[in-house]
Design a protein with these regions (language model features):
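Secondary-structure junction motif
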Residues: 191-212, 281-282, 298-299
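Hydrophobic hinge/microswitch elements
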Residues: 128-133, 137-141, 146-147, 209-257
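Short helix-boundary/capping micro-motifs
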Residues: 10-28
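Flexible hinge/capping segments at coil-to-helix
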Residues: 157-192, 196, 282
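A late-sequence structural motif
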Residues: 258-301
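Conserved amphipathic alpha-helical core elements
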Residues: 39-40, 113
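Central regulatory/effector-binding core of bacterial HTH transcription factors
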Residues: 90-153
Length: 302
């Protein structure tokens, strides 16, 4: 409904990149460039300065960007007001989650949400915590759920639920009969960890720092990109690891892994992260409220 040229310009201005804007809008870069040039011709002035493979807004571009921000806020407010009158809750939302959350928490949440709001389609993108925060910053997703602290103060971060991490070993490991372990007792073991940028790895690093240690002090033999891969490696007797307790319910029941409580314990927060827009799609507000309620009702699942 809003002017397509203005939508494209606004995205380029926000990201300061034609390439990133094309990816965000699912357009080709030449198509994005064409739309911006059309708007520049309409105003008979340049909106961007292009130098050394970088772009910046001209004075006119800054003016247009400011007005376009207000226009899209009003458009969103109008859309929500009309949908409130008709009672319609529909649309497409893009949600992002770090690997652990996407695999073990969101399937049930999104399944229940879809039953309540069948006309809302939720697309899920999976990355590590750093990747999800970056997607929120670039407006590539409407709502993110992460397992590590968010440093960007311009984003809204809401606590969802606590998560506990435990050490896992194979049933044949020398410590398998124990109930509790200190991380120092695992220092000589082959260690399997998540990749850089993972929320799990960041939390473990912070934990070790508090104990006067570092990930580099561990005998790391492998970095893997998902809890499933780590569990498989530990089950095969390749080493030990530290993972979220929510990821190992099945393996504990089957007896293929043994969980050891850490002393002192490691706890972290699963958090929602989103932009500070004053006005959002009604469907986004409903998803956020549904997710808050879901988190409260599942606080004691572990």
């Amino acid at each position: 409904m809003a002017d397509r040229r203005l939508q494209v310009f606004h995205t380029v201005a926000r990201l300061l990149s034609f390439t990133k804007a094309a990816e965000s809008l699912h357009m080709t870069q030449p198509a994005v460039t064409f739309q911006v040039r059309q708007l520049e011709e309409y105003f008979n002035t340049r909106l961007f300065d292009r130098t050394h493979n970088r772009i910046s807004l001209t004075e006119a571009g800054q003016r247009v960007y400011g007005f376009s921000d207000r226009i899209f806020e009003l458009y969103s407010e109008m859309e929500n007001a009309v949908r409130d009158m008709t009672g319609e809750i529909s649309g497409v939302l893009v949600m992002g989650a770090s690997t652990t959350i996407a695999e073990y928490m969101l399937p049930a949440l999104l399944g229940d949400f879809k039953k309540k709001y069948p006309d809302v389609n939720v697309h899920l993108r999976v990355s590590n915590s750093d990747g999800i925060v970056s997607m929120v910053e670039n407006n590539d997703i409407d709502l993110g759920v992460v397992e590590a602290p968010v440093m960007n103060k311009n984003l809204v971060v809401e606590e969802c639920r606590k998560d506990r991490l435990v050490a896992i070993v194979s049933p044949l490991h020398a410590l398998a009969a124990n109930r509790q372990v200190q991380v120092g007792e695992l220092m000589s073991d082959a260690f399997i960890v998540r990749e850089e940028g993972s929320g799990t790895r960041e939390v473990i690093q912070d934990y070790l720092t508090e104990l006067g240690m570092n990930v580099a002090d561990l005998h790391v033999i492998m970095e893997l990109g998902s809890p499933e891969a780590i569990k498989g490696a530990v089950e095969a007797g390749m080493g030990v690891s530290i993972v979220s307790e929510v990821t190992i319910h099945k393996e504990l029941q089957l007896g293929t892994l043994v969980a050891l409580e850490l002393d002192p314990p490691i706890e972290r927060l699963f958090s929602f992260v989103h932009q500070k827009q004053k006005f959002r799609q009604r469907a986004m507000d409903e998803l956020l409220e549904f997710a808050r309620t879901y988190c409260l009702s599942h606080q004691d699942d572990d």
